[in-house]
């Protein structure tokens, strides 16, 4: 073989051995079709989560969630291609000893080079924490510049020393998957809205008993009454739309309905008590116990020919809540719903993130609700549910809190 042929053969072998660059995965964002009907699942929420499936789309006649703002789903980075080196040829008996002596010589240099590598690993591990601190610090600058100084009952202070403020600002970051500019925009809109709406004052406002009596409740269930661990407490909001006496009366005045619904949410936030949080009970994107269960009961509700006022109230409430109450929904249960529903899910898709839709669980049988809470650290939670929802507790009228009514 000529010298040129040898070089060509070597080049060809090297090209074949080169690692192939990993291709980025295809976009895995779930595409939800515009369906006018859905099948209500009989599986529990935990069984659905185990299958890693997006629940069937659902619809409701009124506000379905205090949900997170829409955020792009996380994408997994492609794994780097690895090349497995060929094993070196076995050394002869005559050459083994000299090779060992030669290898022993540069050992100190190898030990020295380990230090920079360890430093790099530490820097890489610290990078996410540093980025999070930078994001919280940026959001704190927004709070300092704004005239309104409160969110969800928390008086905003320096998050480096105030745990409640750190929790609030971290929720805005988490709702936007760490995207600081988006979090800044949502936080600014929330501060503007709270400054105008004054939701804490709505807690002192009396609403019409004829319109809203028996329509909304807040319950608080604790594993230990004196525990400061937020994971040992579960807060619920209940919307009993079957108790609506007149659709037009309840939903016809849009501003009044929104005010009542906001007052109920703020009542739940008082029970959640983020303002009372203290170290070490902070939050991360993966671990956040400061969230609320929501239950909407549609027993005896007809989903045919809903008035325009109901649809308008639904659309406005979803839009408002998805902006100003991010990362506060734990899971949402639609109980006693008909098998076929329609218009509401189309509205949800416009405002609610896909990761939030996965928290929605339609159920045709309200009596099965108590079985959904086996994963809660409040071990008695299922039994604490009212009897009509499969538990052993008293009815909501006896145990739940309502907004002020006259």
Curated annotation (Swiss-Prot):
Residues 45-54 have a biased composition (Basic and acidic residues). Residues 11-26, 55-117 have a biased composition (Low complexity). GO terms for molecular function: metal ion binding; phosphatidylinositol transfer activity. Its main location: cytoplasm. It is found in: Cytoplasm; Endoplasmic reticulum membrane; Microsome membrane. Heme binds at residues 241, 261, 296, 298, 332. GO terms for biological process: Golgi to plasma membrane protein transport; phospholipid transport; regulation of exocytosis. InterPro entries: CRAL-TRIO_dom, CRAL-TRIO_dom_sf, CRAL/TRIO_N_dom, CRAL/TRIO_N_dom_sf, Sfh5. Its cofactor is heme b. It is a peripheral membrane protein. Residues 216-397 form the CRAL-TRIO domain. Keywords: Cytoplasm, Endoplasmic reticulum, Heme, Iron, Lipid transport, Membrane, Metal-binding, Microsome, Transport. Residues 1-130 are annotated as: Disordered. The keyword Endoplasmic reticulum applies. One of its GO terms (cellular component) is cortical endoplasmic reticulum. PROSITE patterns: CRAL_TRIO. It catalyses: a 1,2-diacyl-sn-glycero-3-phospho-(1D-myo-inositol)(in) = a 1,2-diacyl-sn-glycero-3-phospho-(1D-myo-inositol)(out). Belongs to the SFH5 family. Non-classical phosphatidylinositol (PtdIns) transfer protein (PITP), which exhibits PtdIns-binding/transfer activity in the absence of detectable PtdCho-binding/transfer activity. Regulates PtdIns(4,5)P2 homeostasis at the plasma membrane. Heme-binding protein that may play a role in organic oxidant-induced stress responses. This is Phosphatidylinositol transfer protein SFH5. The lineage of its organism: Eukaryota, Fungi, Dikarya, Ascomycota, Pezizomycotina. The gene is SFH5.
């Amino acid at each position: 073989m000529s010298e040129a042929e040898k070089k060509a053969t070597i080049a060809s072998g090297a090209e074949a051995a080169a690692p192939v660059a990993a291709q980025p995965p295809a976009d895995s964002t779930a595409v939800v079709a515009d369906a006018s009907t859905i099948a209500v699942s009989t599986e529990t929420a935990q069984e659905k989560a185990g299958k890693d499936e997006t629940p069937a789309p659902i619809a409701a006649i009124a506000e379905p969630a205090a949900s997170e703002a829409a955020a792009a789903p996380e994408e997994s980075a492609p794994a780097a291609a690895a090349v497995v080196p060929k094993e070196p040829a076995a050394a002869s008996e005559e050459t083994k000893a000299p090779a060992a002596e030669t290898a022993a010589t540069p050992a100190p240099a190898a030990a020295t080079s380990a230090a920079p590598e360890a430093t790099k690993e530490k820097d890489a591990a610290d990078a996410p924490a540093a980025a999070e601190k930078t994001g919280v610090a940026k959001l704190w600058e927004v709070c300092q510049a704004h005239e309104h100084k409160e969110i969800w009952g928390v008086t905003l202070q320096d998050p480096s020393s105030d745990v409640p403020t750190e929790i609030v600002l971290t929720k805005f970051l988490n709702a936007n998957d760490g995207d600081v500019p988006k979090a800044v925009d949502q936080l600014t809109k929330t501060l503007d809205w709270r400054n105008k709406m004054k939701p804490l004052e709505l807690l002192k406002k009396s609403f019409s008993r004829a319109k809203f009596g028996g329509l909304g409740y807040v319950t608080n269930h604790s594993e230990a009454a004196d525990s400061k661990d937020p994971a040992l407490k579960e807060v619920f909001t209940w919307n009993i739309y079957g108790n609506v006496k007149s659709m037009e009366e309840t939903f016809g005045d849009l501003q009044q309905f929104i005010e009542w619904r906001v007052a109920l949410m703020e009542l739940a936030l008082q029970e959640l008590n983020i303002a009372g949080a203290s170290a070490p009970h902070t939050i991360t994107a993966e671990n956040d116990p400061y969230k609320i269960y929501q239950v909407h009961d549609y027993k005896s509700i007809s989903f045919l020919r809903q008035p325009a006022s109901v649809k308008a109230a639904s659309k406005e409430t979803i839009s408002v809540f998805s902006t100003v109450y991010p990362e506060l929904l734990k899971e949402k249960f639609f109980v006693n719903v008909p098998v076929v529903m329609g218009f509401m899910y189309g509205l949800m898709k416009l405002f609610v993130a896909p990761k939030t839709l996965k928290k929605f669980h339609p159920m045709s049988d309200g009596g099965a609700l108590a079985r959904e809470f086996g994963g809660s650290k409040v071990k008695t939670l299922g039994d604490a549910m009212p009897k009509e929802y499969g538990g052993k507790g008293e009815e909501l009228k006896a145990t739940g809190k309502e907004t002020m009514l006259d």
